[in-house]
Structures are given as C-alpha cells and as structure tokens.
C-alpha cells in the first residue's frame, strides 16, 4: 500500500485571546510571545522529523505567522488557502467560555458558520491538497475548530470527540492511502517545552 499524501496538521501558537480563554473564530488576532516560541519549537521539531514539500496556511495572522516561523526552519514555501480559515463563530467571537455559557445556553451562536458549510470547505481544501500535492509531505497550519473537525471526520468520531481540546501548537498527522484518510497521531505536544 502506498501513501499518497501525508499532512501534518499544526494548530497555531498561542495568542493573547487564547491565554484569556476568548473564542477567536475569524477575528484576526496575532501570536503572543509564547505563541512565537511555540512556533519555533514546532519548526525545530518538524525540521528533524521529515523532509517537507510545502506549508499550507490559513490566512489569519496567528496561523500565517506560525507557518512563516516554521518555514524559516524547513525552507519551503508557505501558501495561503482560504478553505482552512477558522470557523466563524458569529457574535460569540471575543467572548470567554463563561460569557458564552451565560449568553447562549444551547451553544447556538447567532451568525456562526453551520457544520455543513464548514465540512464542505474543509473537504474541498483537503481534496485540493490531495490533487495538487500527490505523494508529498504537507504541513497545514490552521486552527482548533478546523483541525478538530478534520480529525472528527477522519476518525468517524471514534477517537476524537466533541469534548476533546486541541492544544496550541499541537501536531496531528493524517495520510491518504488508496482511497481513505488515516490518522497516525493527534494532539501531540512532546516537542513543546
């Protein structure tokens, strides 16, 4: 069986809003100093781990900055793809978990992107990667909800649940073999000190 495409999913480093527990969504918040350190640790680890062909990034600052820092270590181009922008959480963006729980008991946030829209754009993005980078090793820098959704889809929710939290700068690896995606590992943070 031959591996067609391998993707290392990297969640962006920490931002001030992450530190405060605020939901970011598509609000364009940059990395903080710890986030830049985490991105450097990702870059150092990934440079020793394998030979990479390309980095694909969400266009949001926190992901793009993480991707640019990683690129410094592995010297491959960074390509932005809108398909991997974070989920739009509507009016809940900027709110803490406590504020959201108080304001939206049912967790339905007015103006948020629906699951079908998110699934559709993420699957389109993954199919583009598969088509454009066959038999390549790809780093995809994205966001918590995006990576979580991809992992849930790939595992049929068998190993990744709704409640699982992805850490900033965590690494998860998926590969496409023959006609299906396989999760090799997820939410790894051993590279962070």
Residue spans of the language-model regions?
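Short glycine/proline- and acidic residue-enriched helix-loop micro-motifs
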Residues: 99-117
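Short active-site segment of divalent metal-dependent hydrolases/proteases
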Residues: 15, 146-147
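Generic beta-sheet signal
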Residues: 7, 136-144
